């Protein structure tokens, strides 16, 4: 049997419509999770810039949810999160600041920026020493967590101690205009209470890798295709990504999952 490109596009769009209840259920599961990770990346729809937002949750029934929006504003993140009130893992993009709940910022991003700072100022012992001192905070936290399980009270005490040390490192340079360490020092102060939640909460990741991995296929397809041509195309692309990435994360057979959806006739669109 031969299928034209148009026929394939129509089938995929109908499949996306047919699975709307499944995707709504996945979003509800994500919002009910105690932990969620978010990230965003650029996407073009009909030549216009927009963003794909990725929402990922851990646990035995993980969720991977993709959403396209023309905007990269923080309101998109809060709308997508809905009534979520758990710990949100993200990078340091200001759009996530609108979330009023508990936050864990990504240490992978901070460590990369510290490494760049050291490389750019390798001959400045003060800069290198400061960056290494911030890195030691992370290493100390991980070393403590790699040992025997800590009681909740001890985890809280450790987190407070690390936050206090981060504050002292931050205030050292935050007021010195033009100093190489100033930007990251201000970041430490701005997010002082969002750097060591992973110490307080067992199982909470210190990085945002789950959301970043979710968006990697989006980045690859963007480079190959340039994006989508219409709103229908974007909706279909996000629907397929949500389902297939969730099935993959749960170790499910995508072919069997598709068959269960296609057991009933696809709707006309």
Task: For the regions a language model picked out, list residue spans one by one.
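Catalytic center-proximal scaffold of phosphoryl-transfer enzymes
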Residues: 1-269
């Amino acid at each position: 049997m031969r299928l034209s490109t148009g026929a394939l596009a129509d089938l995929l769009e109908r499949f996306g419509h047919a699975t709307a209840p499944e995707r709504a259920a996945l979003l509800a599961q994500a919002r009910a999770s105690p932990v969620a990770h978010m990230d965003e990346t650029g996407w073009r729809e009909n030549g216009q810039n927009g963003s794909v937002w990725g929402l990922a949750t851990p646990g035995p029934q993980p969720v991977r949810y993709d959403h396209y929006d023309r905007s990269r504003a923080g309101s998109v993140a809060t709308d997508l999160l809905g009534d979520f009130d758990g710990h949100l893992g993200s990078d340091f993009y200001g759009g996530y600041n609108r979330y009023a709940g508990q936050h864990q910022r990504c240490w992978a991003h901070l460590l990369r920026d510290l490494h760049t700072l050291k490389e750019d100022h390798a001959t400045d012992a003060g800069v290198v020493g400061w960056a290494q001192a911030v890195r030691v905070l992370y290493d100390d936290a991980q070393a403590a967590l790699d040992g025997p399980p800590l009681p909740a009270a001890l985890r809280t005490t450790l987190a407070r101690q690390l936050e206090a040390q981060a504050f002292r490192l931050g205030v050292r340079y935050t007021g010195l205009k033009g100093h190489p360490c100033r930007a990251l020092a201000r970041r430490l102060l701005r997010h002082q209470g969002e750097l060591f939640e992973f110490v307080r909460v067992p199982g909470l990741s210190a990085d945002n890798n789950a959301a970043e991995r979710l968006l990697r296929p989006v980045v690859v397809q963007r480079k190959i295709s340039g994006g989508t041509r219409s709103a229908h195309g974007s909706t279909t692309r996000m629907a397929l990504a949500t389902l297939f990435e969730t099935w993959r994360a749960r170790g499910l057979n995508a072919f069997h999952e598709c068959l269960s959806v296609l057991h009933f006739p696809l709707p006309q669109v």
